[in-house]
A protein has these predicted regions:
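Extended substrate/RNA-proximal surfaces in nucleic-acid metabolism proteins
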Residues: 1-98
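Active-site environment of divalent metal-dependent phosphoester hydrolases
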Residues: 19-21, 76-80, 104-107, 130-134
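Conserved strand-to-helix beginnings and helix N-cap segments that scaffold or border functional pockets
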Residues: 55-56, 83-84, 109-110, 136-140
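Short secondary-structure boundary segments
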Residues: 99-102, 127-129
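Mid-to-C-terminal alpha-helical segments outside catalytic/metal-binding sites
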Residues: 139, 143-171
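Short acidic/histidine-rich active-site segments
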Residues: 121-137
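Short, hinge-like loop/turn segments at secondary-structure boundaries
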Residues: 30-32, 87-90, 113-117, 142-145
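A C-terminal functional module that forms or caps the active site or interfaces directly
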Residues: 85, 96-98, 104, 108-112
Length: 171
């Protein structure tokens, strides 16, 4: 990664989107899956109705493991939460909510993100880029939408939180 330290390239850190499993809060060596040089873990919750065990595991990651929990693409999960109690409890936790930049292409996802923003929840933006063909980098469209809808200050707030979580200087 030495060649990537040139100012012409954006800083890149090794990280993983960690798929939730029952008991993850007690998993050994989980810290190895944190984003490089941070205590932040990007956690993908199950695409099913969450229960108290999922909630307890997330709490354990924060309180007992002292990790900064980032819930990956949170806007995708609302539709799976037919019983909203756990959803609401999850939204009250001191986690960071990561949303994908393409959230604005879907009315229900826009609504979820709007509620997060209006509730002043900590938010970061991700691209969910897997390749340059069918899952292309799309951060610009996400930032443009947020800027148009919520203002440049919101974009700066999201960007600064991302920098802070990754251990980069904030402006």
């Amino acid at each position: 990664t030495e060649y990537m330290k040139d100012d012409a390239y954006p800083a890149i850190k090794l990280g993983a989107e960690v798929c939730y499993f029952n008991g993850i809060g007690q998993a050994r060596e989980l810290e190895k899956l944190c984003i490089e040089d941070t205590d932040a873990i990007l956690l993908e919750l199950p695409f099913t109705q969450w229960n108290k065990f999922v909630l307890q595991d997330v709490i354990m990651l924060m309180e007992e493991r002292c990790l900064t929990v980032i819930l990956a693409h949170i806007e995708r999960f609302y539709a799976f939460q037919t019983r909203k109690k756990i959803w609401k409890e999850m939204l009250e936790l001191p986690v960071i909510f990561q949303v994908n930049a393409d959230f604005h292409d879907n009315r229900k996802k826009r609504k979820v993100v709007k509620k997060l923003i209006e509730s002043d929840k900590p938010l970061i933006l991700g691209s969910d880029c897997h390749n340059v063909e069918n899952r292309k980098p799309n951060l610009i469209s996400g930032y443009d939408y947020i800027s148009d809808k919520y203002g440049k200050k919101m974009v700066e707030q999201i960007d600064n939180l991302g920098r802070e979580v990754l251990g980069f200087d904030t402006k």
